[in-house]
């Protein structure tokens, strides 16, 4: 918890909201989203129906995004993650850690875990 407060740049033991959501596609789990949110930027976060909207969409409306940071890592998932994502054996995950800024401060930090066999990342950029 102290590390998380430090990541947000707030005092240790400050309140943070937390949500854990498993996202499905064609009845298969494809993402485990664990998100922490700064309450003063999204005070109604814990009352939102995330069956109707995503945390990202909600946060984009109440605390418009100014900056986003992505960190990608290949990791071996913990047992809990493996079960929630219906993963087999020693399959690795792609872990994306996303920090989002709004109103000059970090609004949320999300840990997004994707089963290695069910996720592909691609991009196309122009210089």
Predicted regions and their residues:
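C-terminal all-alpha effector/ligand-binding and dimerization domain
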Residues: 1-127
